[in-house]
From Swiss-Prot:
An example Gene Ontology molecular-function term: thiosulfate-thiol sulfurtransferase activity
Enzyme kind, highest EC tier: transferase
InterPro entries in alphabetical order: Rhodanese-like_dom (IPR001763), Rhodanese-like_dom_sf (IPR036873), TSTD1_mml (IPR042457)
Modulation of this protein's activity: GSS(-) is a potent inhibitor of TSTD1, since the presence of the sulfur dioxygenase (SDO) strongly increases the TSTD1 catalytic activity.
Tissues expressing the protein: Highly expressed in kidney, liver and skeletal muscle. Lower levels of expression in heart, colon, thymus, spleen, placenta and lung. Weakly expressed in brain, small intestine and peripheral blood leukocytes. No expression in the cell lines EFO-27 and HeLa, or the normal breast tissue cell lines MCF-10A and H184A1.
Protein name: Thiosulfate:glutathione sulfurtransferase
Superkingdom field: Eukaryota
Entry's EC annotation: 2.8.1.3
Domain Rhodanese: 17-115
Subcellular location: Cytoplasm, Perinuclear region
PROSITE patterns membership: RHODANESE_3
Length: 115
């Protein structure tokens, strides 16, 4: 997908294996509850802008996870098919998260290749 840096499935596998990626599932809570990539934090795309602008303590309280830092290198956003992941990546980059990337293959590819 054009418009934002992407990560491929082999690259994502490598980042996850090394523990260097922060993974964000931007699908709805219902979609994520039905299955997601292990280790992903679910923040629906509709909440993402406010989430990324929260104080770290508020983010921690709401999502039970550390808020990403602007300088974090490997912030990977994904959805079901790629569109919301792209939207989320563009949003994060516009807020100064320069390491934000879209897993363009999305959960659909993960499910096909990893299940």
């Amino acid at each position: 997908m054009a418009g934002a840096p992407t990560v491929s499935l082999p690259e994502l596998r490598s980042l996850l294996a090394s523990g260097r990626a922060r993974l964000f599932d931007v699908r709805s809570r219902e979609e994520a509850a039905a299955g997601t990539i292990p280790g992903a934090l679910n923040i629906p795309v509709s909440e993402l802008e406010s989430a990324l602008q929260m104080e770290p303590a508020a983010f921690q309280a709401l999502y039970s996870a550390e808020k990403p830092k602007l300088e974090d290198e490997h912030l990977v956003f994904f959805c079901q098919m790629g569109k919301r992941g792209l939207q989320a990546t563009q949003l994060a980059r516009s807020l100064g998260y320069t390491g934000a990337r879209n897993y363009a293959g999305a959960y659909r590819e993960w499910l096909e290749k990893e299940s």
